Amino acid sequence: MRHLHFGKLFFVVFSLLLACTVSARKPIKTLLITGQNNHNWQVSHVVLKQILENSGRFDVDFAISPEQGKDMSGFVLDFSPYQLVVLDYNGDSWPEETNRRFLEYVQNGGGVVIYHAADNAFSKWPEFNKICLLYTSDA
């Protein structure tokens, strides 16, 4: 009987410790990239941020690109502070430096979520299409 009570006590203590550990996790630092899209990005990026942050698991920053057709050369992003990048973007090509940094981020284990039309963003960029699982050697 004594072992049964010890087992129950151990289970309760372990469960409480586990619950405290789970609730004490730091939010996932997230970069949401937007600014150009064939859909209403002005609304979608705000809603995406609300959904993510309301879960209590994400801390979301925005990177908003220049308007479509404008100079993109200054749109150079630092992905290093982020565990996750969410793309709500379907527009002009990024500068080569941003492309390089993005690929490096992914190759080093950075997380990526491609939201809706963002899978069409860079059809002529094979590495991006591989990230989206859209690339075939015949394409």
Regions found by a protein language model. Give the residues of each.
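Bacterial N-terminal signal peptides that target proteins for export
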Residues: 1-10
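Short, low-complexity interaction segments enriched in Ser/Thr/Pro/Gly
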Residues: 5, 22-26
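Bacterial N-terminal signal peptides
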Residues: 10-19
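Helical hinge/lid and interdomain linker segments adjacent to catalytic or ligand-binding clefts
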Residues: 25, 29-122
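Cysteine-nucleophile active-site neighborhood
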Residues: 125-128
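Metal-dependent phosphoesterases centered on the DNase I-like endonuclease/exonuclease/phosphatase
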Residues: 132
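Conserved small/polar residues in nucleotide/adenosyl-binding loops
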Residues: 135-139
